[in-house]
Amino acid sequence: MGFISVSVGDGMGDICRDLGADYLIEGGQTMNPSTEDVLKAIEQVHAKNIFVFPNNKNIILAANQARDLTEDKNIIVIPTKTIPPGYHGNDQLCAGEDGGAEYRGDAAVHRHVKTGQVTYAVRDTKIDDKEIRQGNIMGIGDHGILAVGEGVEGITMETIDAMVDEDTEIISVYYGSDVSAEDAQRLGEKLEERYPDFDVEVNDGGQPIYYYVVSVE
């Protein structure tokens, strides 16, 4: 059984490898791998059953096309739209009764793992009835804009506040290449103060564009 993940940032890649990824494809919002890129990855993984985690809605089509073009291996595309559900998706892999591979829990992964991404606006716009100015910091959730404002830390906190609920147990924070370790650690400490009953994890994601990628589960 093999595991291919699309990742962006050295830290994100390291985490994927630690979780058992056999092959990483560089991707992200501005670097969308092609069908050929996914096919090359499939060729490099020596397994009959291979799970592919696109981790971006724009890459799911390419992954599905690569699956359809592959005849000698069983390719299972898990339609993850962001990286955190892809991390947790690996825990749902198991062997089928016939020795093949099955994926149990795709719906559960998407239901229980919420993702938030904090970035900046490149132009003036209006989304989800929110006025956004060029340079504003935005917190984006699974279903739209959660927070808009001026400060990265403050908007990240607002984004997480909007994501947590009574079932939340873990908050995982992945800080990007434009965030210092000190700033990320300070954010983690504030989260621990605000949510003392939750496990708070701070990781160096190294991703560009997004100051923070957050998962809440």
Question: In which residue ranges do the predicted regions lie?
Answer:
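N-terminal loops that bind phosphate or other acidic moieties
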Residues: 1-217
